[in-house]
């Protein structure tokens, strides 16, 4: 019985880590798909969608069961820089729109340096980087 308990104490954390990596990979894939759908919308209508509902993705949830976050800077108006996600130097990650998942903790803050943002799955550099905010 002690051997089974020991094996379980080793296997469960490994399994949980694998599940979390799979959720992150799924969020990254979803963001790539959304990015492609946003680009097709922009080509067709010569503007970015105001929200994800315009590309029929308003109810899409991330792997942690939270909605994906999207902000079109054109729709946000002149104060968009205050709402944009920012890197370690407080420079906006993108110049047209932000798209991200709030990650496992379901919380986020504008600068990536905020503790709540570390597990966010972000799109930065106009899609040149999609991954964990903590890795950017």
Language-model features: locations:
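Conserved short-loop catalytic and cofactor-binding motifs
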Residues: 3, 22, 53
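Short, histidine-centered active-site or binding-site loop motifs used for metal coordination
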Residues: 19, 38, 103
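Aliphatic-rich helix starts adjacent to a transmembrane/signal segment
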Residues: 14-31
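Short, surface-exposed interaction loops/tails
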Residues: 76-136
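Extracellular/periplasmic head regions of type IV pilus-like filament subunits
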Residues: 36-95, 136
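N-terminal single-pass transmembrane signal-anchor helix
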Residues: 1-16
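Conserved catalytic core of two-component sensor histidine kinases
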Residues: 1, 28, 35
